[in-house]
């Protein structure tokens, strides 16, 4: 899981891979993009953001042997993804959207609540669901996890 910043994407990818201990069967690496409009503008705008995201996604994918996932908010999907290059739209997305299900992207996971409760864990936890059946999830685990 990598929280994307405005630093050069290749150095972020190098850092992520150096610090990660990816093991066989792990879920694919995740690129969490939660930059403010101001920070996106400061880095050169949405086209620069998209280019940098692709650098990270391709490099981490190449070196990890699996296709990373993009984690974004529904607001990001609405405001930025319509302008994303087709190459970026091919990546699966984990959307944080609380309330109504309305992704408009190739949704893989949906974070539907930031304040769920789970027995054995103190405090709030995110509640997430896979967008598919149990059979589809098992197939995903067999084919898309780290090798």
Question: Predicted segment positions?
Answer:
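Conserved N-terminal glycine/acidic-rich loop preference
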Residues: 47-48, 52-53, 78-92
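Functionally critical loop-and-helix segments that line ligand-binding/catalytic clefts
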Residues: 84-147
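Structural recognition of the beta-strand scaffold that forms the well-ordered cores
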Residues: 1-2, 27-33, 68-71, 92-95, ...
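Short amphipathic alpha-helical surface micro-motifs
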Residues: 11-14, 74-78, 89-94
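Solvent-exposed loop/turn segments at secondary-structure junctions
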Residues: 3-8, 34-39, 74-78, 99-102, ...
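Aromatic-lined carbohydrate-recognition surfaces of secreted/lumenal glycan-active proteins
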Residues: 64-79
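Substrate-binding cleft of extracellular glycoside hydrolase catalytic domains
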Residues: 1-63
């Amino acid at each position: 899981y990598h929280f994307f910043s405005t630093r050069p994407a290749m150095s972020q990818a190098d850092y992520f891979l150096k610090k990660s201990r990816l093991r066989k069967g792990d879920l694919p690496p995740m690129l969490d993009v939660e930059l403010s409009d101001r920070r996106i503008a400061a880095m050169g705008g949405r086209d620069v953001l998209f280019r940098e995201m692709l650098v990270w996604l391709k490099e981490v994918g190449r070196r990890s042997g699996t296709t990373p996932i993009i984690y974004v908010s529904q607001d990001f999907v609405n405001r930025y993804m319509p302008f994303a290059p087709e190459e970026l739209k091919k990546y699966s997305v984990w959307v944080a959207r609380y309330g109504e299900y309305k992704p408009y992207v190739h949704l893989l996971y949906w974070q539907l609540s930031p304040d769920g409760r789970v027995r054995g864990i103190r405090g709030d936890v995110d509640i997430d669901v896979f967008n598919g059946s149990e059979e589809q999830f098992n197939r995903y685990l067999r084919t898309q996890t780290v090798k």
